Structures are given as C-alpha cells and as structure tokens.
Amino acid sequence: MNTQTGTGTSEVSKKLKAAIRAKLEELGVYVDDELPDYIMVMIANKKEKVQMKDDLNLFIGKSTAKFVDWLFDLFDRLQNASNKQGETSKKEEDKRKELEATAAAKEHEEKRRKEKEEHEKELQKEKEREKERQRERDREKRAEEEKRREEKRKEIQRSKRRRTRSRSNTYSDEEEHVRARGEKHDRHHHKDHRRGRSHERKIITSTIVRQASASPDKKLHSTVTVKRNIRPTGDQNIKGRGTMFLRAMNEASVSAGYGSSSKRSETHHEDDMSDVEALPSKPASTKSPKKSIRDRMSRISKTSEPPIEEDDAVVLEDFAQTGGGPQMILKLSGGREAIKKTRIQDRIVVDDGLRRGLLKRKIETASGASAGAATSEEPKSKHDRIIFDITPSRDSTPTDDSPTMQKWNGQIEIGDDSEESEDDEEAEIDAFVAEARGIARRESFRDEEDELPPTHQLSGGPYAYHHSTAAPTYIPTPLSVLSEQQNQMGGGAAKEDHHVKERCIFWPKCTKGDTCAFMHPTTNCKNFPNCTFGIRCLFIHPPCRFDRFCTKKHCPFTHHGTGGQQPGGAQLTSEFKNPLTSSRMLTVPSPFIAATAAAVEELPKPAARGALGSLAEKLAASIKKKPAPGAESEKKEEKSDENESKAEEPKAEVAPVQPKPLPDIAPLHSMVLCRYAGACRNPICHFKHPKECRFGANCRNPSCYFYHKPAGAAPTPVAAPIAAESAGAAKYKWTSATAN
C-alpha cells in the first residue's frame, strides 16, 4: 500500500514540476533546471502565499504574483479532486457492503421458504394418508352394515315365504263360495259366447244395419265401465285435428259423468270380453289379443251396477233375430256434416289403435239368462249411431280352437242427426279447419300459377305445364306449417309489381325510368358467361367491347349499339347489285318480316347458310349475264343491261315469297362490317362491305377504303357451293364467258 502511495506521489510531483515549467515558459521567464526544483521545495515546505511571492520576485519579476496565484489555484483543485476521490471510494465500499448484506438476507429468506414448502408438502401428504385410512375404515363399516342388512332382508323373506306357504294350503269358506258361484255363472251364461268367438275368428263379415228400433228397456246383468283415455290413432296424418278432437271428447266424457277419476264396474270374468276379439284387427299386428284383453281386464274394479248412459258408448249386444252372431252398436258423437267435412269416408283406418280407442270408451255388455234368447236394446239418443253387424259365415263351422280371423270388410252408414250438442260443434269446427286447409292450399297453388311471369321462353324451349284440376285427397297439415306457408304466399302476392317480366330493349338508355313497363336489370347475372337466356336475361351482362360490330352469333355480352338485338339478327339485304358492296335493306311485306322474326325467335340456333340460296341465285344470274371484259363501250352496254336485269330481279323475287320456307331462313349480318373490308374475295360473303370505288382498277390510292374489282380477271365459278346450299340454284348452268 505504501509502495503504491509513493509511486503515486512521485508521479504527481513529476506532473506538477512539468506544469510549473510550462507555466513559467508561458509567462516568458527564463527557466533553468534549478528554478522548478526550488519551487517544488517551497511547496514541500508549505510556505504561505506572501512568503512565496517575496522569494520568487527575484527570479520571476513582474509575473511573480500571477504565477503564485496560478500555483495556489492548482493546489486547491488537486485537493478537491483527492477529497472527492476519497468520498467516492468510501461510497462504493458502503454500497458493496450493503449489496453483500442484501444478498445474504435473500439467500437466508429463500432457504427458509424452501424449508416451509417442504414442511407443508409433508403435512399435505400426511393428511392424504389420513384421509385414505379414514376411507378404508368407512368402506369396512359400510360392508359390515350391508352384510347385516342383507342378512336381515333374507330373514324377512324367509319368514314371508313361510307365512305364504301356510296361507296357500287353506281356503276360506267365502272364497270357495265365490269361486263356485263364478264357475257356475261361466258355465251357465257364457257357453255360447265362447262358441261364437271361435267361430268369428275364422270368418267375419260386416254389413250395415239400420238404426235399432225403440223397444222396451231391459236390464243388463253386467256392465263394465272403463275410464276414457283418448289417444290418437295409428294414422299419422290426422295430427291436425287431434288436439281439438281430444279436448272435445274429454269434455264430453266429463259431462257424461264417466270421464272423472271414479271407476264404476261390476263383477266380471274373462269370458265377458269374448266379443272384444270380434273387433276387426290387422293380421300383421304383433300384440296378442288375449294379452291386451287381459291387461285391460286387470285394470277394471268390481262395483255395483250403474244405470245405462246414452252418451258416447260402445255397446256389445247379442241379437237373436239377426242370425245368431254377435252385433256391436257403436255410437259416435257428432253429425253427418262433421264426419262428411273431414272426409271420414275416405280415411277410415281400422287397426289396433282404433280398436283400443273404441274399447277405452264406456263398455256395456249384456248377457241373457239363457244361451239362445238374450236380447237387449237401447232407446234412441240424440247422437248418431254406427251399427256393425258381425255375422258368421254360413258355410263355416264353429270351432273353439280357431286362432285367427279375417280382415273386417264391412261398410259404414251414417244416420242423420236432428240436434246438435257442444261436442258436435267442436267436431264441426275441427272439420271446418281441416277443410279450410285443403281449400287454402289449392287456392294458393292456383294463385301462384297465375302469378308466374310470362318468361317460359327464357328456358330454351316451351315446356308444357299440366295442372291437375282434380281435388287433392285431404292430408292434414300442422297449423304451424300451414301458417308459415300462408305467410309466404301472402308476402309473395304483396310484392307483385306492375312490370312486364321482359327486359327493356332500350336499357340502359331508356328515358322512361320507373314508369317503363318493361324490366330494367339492376343486379349482375350469376350464370354469366354460361347464361343461356341471351338478350332475354333479366340480369346484367358485361358490355361487349365490339358492341354493334361484334360478329359472334351467340355472344353472351351486352350490345348497346344494336338496339337490344343480338348481333347477327335476322336482317335481309336489298338489291343484290354486288354482295360485297350492298348496304341497303330489302323492302318486303310486313307479314313476311313478322313471320321471319317469329321463326327466328323460335329457333334456338339458326341454320348457318339457310338464306344464302336466294342470294346465290341472284349472284349466278348476274355473273351469267356479264360478258368478258372488252372495249369501254361494250362495258357500258353490259352495265346498262345488268342494271336493267337487276332492277327487274327484286320485283320477280319478292312476289313469290311464301312463309313456308321460313324455318330454313338464317339471319344475315348485313349491318356488321366484314373484317376484310375491301380486300374480301368471298363472292357470297353476307357481311357488310364498302361500296365499289368509282375509279375501279384505275384507282391510285394505296389506302383507298372502297372495293376495287380485280382488273382483267374473269369471274370465278362458284356453282358447287351454291348448288349445295340451295336446290333453287340447280336451274342455273355456268357457261364460258366468251360463249356470249
């Protein structure tokens, strides 16, 4: 440390000595080697400022005061620098110690935190182990408890079985009496029922019988009444009227007194329901009739005999006078009109579902005192009745082991009703709603057909649409679907506009605006460029860059310069002075033009060369009359003859024109410029060409637009294509030009 201090002091002394020498030289004082050493000795002796001035005045002279002031100022700066350096080093040392203390504290804190976490983890593991041990103890307790309960349950069951065994060995006198009485009643009253049932299972025929006539009332020996629970039948198409019909039937049940929760019935036996199996059923039914009857009978309780009720009942009766077979009188609520409106005569479904629905109504069974003469009749009520006369066939023998029966092939006759009840009104409302659905559906179809726009020509060909005038069979529709359809149809009718469903030929330059009766397209065509409607499309096609000069026959783009017509439309040329220079239109009768336009519209794709036959004939006639080129006088005469013949030709050609060959006429492109212009050498080219130059072969303008006939060139015969294209050209024969 001392060595470093001494080294630093010597360096400071050297620097100070050099600074003193430089300052003296700056002041202009003569400096030798001893003067800086003398000043350094004075500094080391720490002489005061005044003493130093007195001692140096001899050597420095006038600059003594200035030099001494500079020297002491330098001492002050060095002193301040050394003090600051010491303070800085002290601060750094303090900061370093503080950082070391902070690091030690953090390390200690981290160590304590890790120890705490490890301790918490250990406690958590211990808790988990304790919980697992507790669960194990609980499982053992539950197993023991379950075992005790199982033993107790088994003991109770054993005691019950012992009591049941002891009870089953004895019968009370009352039970014996009831059983004996029931067996006697079965043998006495239901012997013929079993025979009739087995016979009915083989063959059943159904016929219509008239309404039962009124007769003195007779008591019924037994009556079975079942609580009505109306369910929809198996037909899934009757959902539309299901809710209203169900509500009406339930209200009728409550008003009749048997729709409540009370049940009234009398003593019964399984054979009392023998006639139930005589109801028609589907042979493909999967449920056994005996099983279903057993299930129904199990729900009937024994009560005292109630009075006979008139409303909505299914009565099973035996009529001895009808041939010995069982008969069923089914009373249906509602009149002829309600059933008629719902078209029940077309939609009667006889299946297991309907049979169950009928059986769940009030059932009244009548059994006579003897097997042959028991007859029960009902008084007339205000409701209609449907009577099924189920009689066995005479050619079949009754057997007890007949397991099947044939399908019900009966008919239904509806009697008139003189009065109407609330149930009838509900049925009429239901039927009216159902009828209104069919009428609304048919009317909506007719309205939709009437509103179809006359755009059948847009589809590339007229397709016939055959609408059936026959009334459709009634198929009920849910009210939600019906209302949605009616809303859609009503919305479509409200949006009907007054525009004709055809595009305006002046669009987009039409000046009428919204008052125009034709359609102005507003949206782009989605099928472009595959749209097949062409100029009849009601949507926007992009404009063609060639516009009215377009030569493509079925160009899908829009051409505003053709007045709404497709380029290459039906246009007939006029006098055939020269096919390459003709620019005038032929004047023909208006019926011919109308028929031609109609024929062209009907043809989806016009023939390529159908109308060129007549032009070829004209060309052949004109060329035939031209002689070989000679003197100018001969040319003038030939031209005059040619003009006269051509003036006569249109008159001769227009007269015999008939609409018969119209389907073969193709549109001419006389308003479309030929791409070769005056250089075209096709004598039957049907595009528009410039007029013939008046200078002819003598024209000296190399860029002349007009047509120049080749000088000295004989006309080239083109009879082969002309004859192939038109049968009328066969009468012309080509001859040499020099033969004339």
Curated annotation (Swiss-Prot):
Single GO term (MF): zinc ion binding
GO cellular component: cytoplasm; nuclear speck; nucleus; perinuclear region of cytoplasm
UniProt keyword annotation of Ribonucleoprotein present: no
Superkingdom, natural source: Eukaryota
Polar residues bias (residue ranges): 204-214, 393-409
PROSITE patterns for this protein: ZF_C3H1 (PS50103)
Bias (Acidic residues) ranges: 414-426
Region ranges (Disordered): 82-240, 254-314, 390-426, 444-469, 623-661
GO biological process, one term: regulation of mRNA stability
Gene3D superfamilies: 4.10.1000.30, 4.10.1000.40, Nuclear abundant poly(A) RNA-bind protein 2, N-terminal domain
Pfam families membership: zf-CCCH_2
Keyword annotations from UniProtKB, A to Z: Cytoplasm, Metal-binding, Nucleus, Repeat, Zinc, Zinc-finger
UniProt key word Metal-binding: yes
Annotated Basic residues bias: 186-200
Zinc fingers (C3H1-type), renumbered ranges: 499-522, 523-543, 668-691, 674-691, 693-709
Biased composition range(s): Basic and acidic residues: 87-158, 176-185, 632-652
Compartment list: Nucleus; Cytoplasm
Similarity field: Belongs to the ZC3H14 family.
The protein's role, per its UniProt record: RNA-binding protein involved in the biogenesis of circular RNAs (circRNAs), which are produced by back-splicing circularization of pre-mRNAs.
Protein name per the record: Zinc finger CCCH domain-containing protein 14
Species of the source: Caenorhabditis elegans
Phylogenetic classification of the source organism: Eukaryota, Metazoa, Ecdysozoa, Nematoda, Chromadorea
